[in-house]
Amino acid sequence: MSAENRALRPDTSRAVITGYGAITPIGNSAATYWESLVAGRSGAGPITHFDASANEVRIAAEVKDFDPTHTMEMKMARRMSRFVQFAVAAATEAIEHAGLATIHEWEAEHRDRVATIINTGGGGIEQVTMGADAFRERGGRFVSPFAIPALSPSMGACMVSMKYGLTGPAITQAAA
């Protein structure tokens, strides 16, 4: 960055983390996650999200008892893959934790100063699998138009930014 640009935006090298949220196999909030972590609880157990009886491995660390309607309308939740629902729920908790619940009332000039940074192990593969099953069993007219976009790991950051009208950087870190 040039000296001239640095002078115009001197805060570009600093970040302030003001809130946090978590949806994990050991807790569906940052507080329950931390309590479980400190207590040494494991999130691993039998797979319940799908029939794993034909698989060699039947144990995973699944998120349990997650209800997306606690943080979004059912109509919105149906259009999202499960990992995006997790991202929106965790971001909602982070925004509330930071005391930014009035984010919708912010002036547009302030919304570009808020970055949305999401970390994920991958995209919504279950949406693509359901789309492939629908295509094979009933034909292309029954494939959701949301199936392919749901595969993108960046959908978490995109949907959080769209829900809250944030126009700052939307960044996705994807790592297995």
Regions found by a protein language model. Give the residues of each.
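Short catalytic-loop micro-motif centered on adjacent basic/acidic residues
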Residues: 170-174
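Gly/Ser-rich catalytic serine loop of serine hydrolases
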Residues: 116, 175-176
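Conserved "HGTGT" condensation-loop signature of ketosynthase/thiolase-family condensing enzymes
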Residues: 1-122, 126-169
